[in-house]
């Protein structure tokens, strides 16, 4: 089963589900859809005898702060074991409205994956049976994997080259 066959099957049964597609450098088909159609599309991919993507390898959230109105996203990595085919299904949405329907009704293993993405990115999986932080403290008010925070403390001086007898080099400046 190749990308064209997968897309033909989806388009035949859900003509408006696919917003765009691309084949990544690793050869895996990426399908972009909407939040409103994600569960129906995932159900089709899992339950259709021709498609048979019965295994949710993982799901992860991503944050692109430069994409206004689509800053956050969730990517579902699916695998058809019988045909050894993998695909990714992606959805994007505003960070101010970070709600996505849960996939735990389709794959119970999505439970902990969704909890992790809630914990690190703040994506709320609507209908999740136990959506709470999984690794961070319950009273943490931020989502640490979002690209909204400095990577290092700007007041640190222990990594300043001037303290090691180096003046810096071309293309590098010191504040």
List the model feature ranges, each with a label.
Residues 1-175:
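Terminal low-complexity/charged segments
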């Amino acid at each position: 089963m190749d990308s064209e066959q997968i897309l033909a099957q989806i388009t035949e049964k859900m003509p408006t589900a696919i917003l765009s597609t691309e084949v990544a450098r690793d050869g895996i088909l990426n399908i972009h859809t909407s939040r409103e159609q994600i569960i129906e599309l995932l159900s089709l991919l899992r339950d259709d005898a021709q498609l048979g993507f019965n295994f949710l390898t993982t799901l992860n959230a991503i944050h692109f702060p430069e994409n206004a109105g689509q800053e956050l996203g969730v990517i579902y990595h699916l695998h058809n074991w019988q045909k050894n085919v993998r695909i990714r299904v992606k959805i994007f949405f505003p960070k101010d409205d970070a709600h996505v329907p849960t996939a735990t009704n389709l794959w119970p293993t999505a439970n902990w994956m969704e909890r992790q993405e809630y914990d690190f990115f703040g994506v709320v999986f609507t209908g999740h049976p136990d959506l709470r932080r999984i690794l961070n403290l319950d009273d943490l008010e931020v989502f640490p994997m979002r690209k909204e925070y400095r990577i290092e403390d700007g007041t640190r001086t222990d990594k300043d080259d001037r303290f090691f007898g180096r003046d810096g080099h071309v293309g590098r400046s010191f504040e």
